[in-house]
């Protein structure tokens, strides 16, 4: 459960693949989280981009748990902690 703790406590974060991809492109994402049960065509381009930019990717078990860790009631395929 440790990976969620950092995300929960993060002051700034992105929720969802569109916002998270933008943060990676702008070099503001510190750590990216992707859900194992998300559609591969949704998260694979994001994971590839993170590798290119040298950003750590943490894979978590479920979209629902990732969403909850972000404080939303629905699932999220990805999220990121944004550097201050």
How should these model regions be labeled?
Residues 21-22, 46, 70:
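Short, flexible, solvent-exposed loop/turn segments with mixed acidic/basic and small polar residues
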Residues 1-30, 39:
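Ribosome large-subunit tunnel/peptidyl-transferase-proximal elements
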Residues 31, 40-58, 65:
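Amphipathic, hydrophobic secondary-structure cores in small proteins
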Residues 9, 35, 55:
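Glycine- and other small-residue-rich loops at beta-strand/loop junctions that grip anionic moieties
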Residues 37-38, 84:
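Short glycine-rich anion-binding loops that position phosphate/pyrophosphate groups of nucleotides
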Residues 28-31, 76-78:
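Short, surface-exposed beta-edge/turn micro-motifs
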Residues 55-84:
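C-terminal structural segments of small proteins and small subunits
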């Amino acid at each position: 459960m440790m990976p969620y703790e950092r995300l929960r406590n993060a002051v700034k974060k992105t929720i969802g693949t569109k916002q998270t991809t933008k943060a990676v492109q702008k070099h503001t994402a510190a750590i990216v989280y992707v859900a194992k049960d998300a559609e591969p065509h949704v998260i694979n381009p994001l994971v590839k981009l993170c590798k290119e930019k040298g950003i750590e990717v943490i894979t978590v078990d479920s979209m629902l748990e990732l969403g909850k860790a972000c404080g939303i009631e629905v699932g999220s395929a990805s999220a990121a902690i944004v550097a201050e």
